[in-house]
């Protein structure tokens, strides 16, 4: 049985196109460690060969997973390495999965060591899991507190800083791709800085938003493009009802908790990181190009003539019968000229390019037993898949924690983000798909032709916006996300915490469309100009009381949480 398998590590659709090739060029750390990471193995295609696919043989494998005592394990994750294809074991510890013959199975379960097993020629597997005490003692963020993995009963997946830094992306969410079972991540478009569509629990609603709730250091954040991936310590993904219930209806689609890096007592550490990545458009929609379009015109004329006299299959039109019959509208060339020269125009290819992303980060952290700090700065420049589309993002972060005494602890975080986006109109790519390829975008002197279609005078040249002064859309955004907290521990096991957050956003958008831009020429209007400014400010005040106590010889524990949250 053959099956078409496509592995895409970066989903980025540029108005119908997707970017699927991403690789690191170089990396630099404070220790002057330089590494070159090989290009990810992915399915891609060039502009002329849209249909390239990777075809591989698949087979069905079965297995039984047991623990160290020989008992079957329920709910063990079985994932095909590098993909989101996977399953979990049933009540008898068994699983069945369709996999490529050369696949590697990743077997994982909380509290046990992860195993990588090559499938090879085997069809049945007997797997014994080993407990991992170090993992069991790790803590994960759940709701308004933390819990050891050995005590965790809900469905929680963790992505650590090391996994995030391996992902060459301006958006940290893409580090979770293929690492969290059941998580689907797609980039909304190929524009620079485009958002990420995250689907954690499937499509629960046709009309409503299915995105999970995203929290940064316990506060609702929203856009993940504002966060520098290098500032993130860990991401916890809460999926089941027991883990997300505390967030009410906002957690109905799952919750992603992002914890940023904080200072640690000890020597001051300086880290410098840099990388360059490239996104390439692929899966470009097919259009009738060149002689295929001519063939379509011939077939259409033959069909029309057959209908006219009722004699089917007797008409055989010539190229001269279908080309040169259009109105032409005074164009400096004829369709026959294009046909004879073979100088057809691939409009989508003229609009697209490879997107280059550069990222640079510098962080300084350290402190004493009482006071710790973390300071970081980042700069990212991302090029979109359309020409003249570019986003520049600059981040600054400061976090300070101070232990006043054994009872009182205070701290603060400040995250500042500045974005400058020279944005392209998404409509031009769609317009390029219905342009006739039997046409030229420029005349013999290199001047752009406003309306190059020999059939429809209203069809504007989709390259018009590339001309200097024809189109300009600049969006400047500033965001300050500041949090302060006070924490009291009057007795052992009892923690009272109050947290206050201010989220201030300012956006300025300027838009100019010349009368000879694509949209204005298409609609026969004059030039258009707009200047918009928006300000947003949100306040969040959380108060929580946590009490944890052990009893019964430390075999049992009781956790009590009381709290209130106010948002304005």
Q: Model-found features: residue ranges?
A:
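Short, small/polar-rich motifs associated with maturation and membrane association
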Residues: 1-397, 402, 409-411, 481-482
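Surface-exposed loop/interface segments of Gram-negative outer-membrane beta-barrel transport/assembly proteins
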Residues: 264-343, 384-391, 395-481, 497-499, ...
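A short, polar/charged loop-to-alpha-helix boundary motif
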Residues: 489
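Active-site and adjacent substrate-binding regions of carbohydrate-active enzymes
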Residues: 493
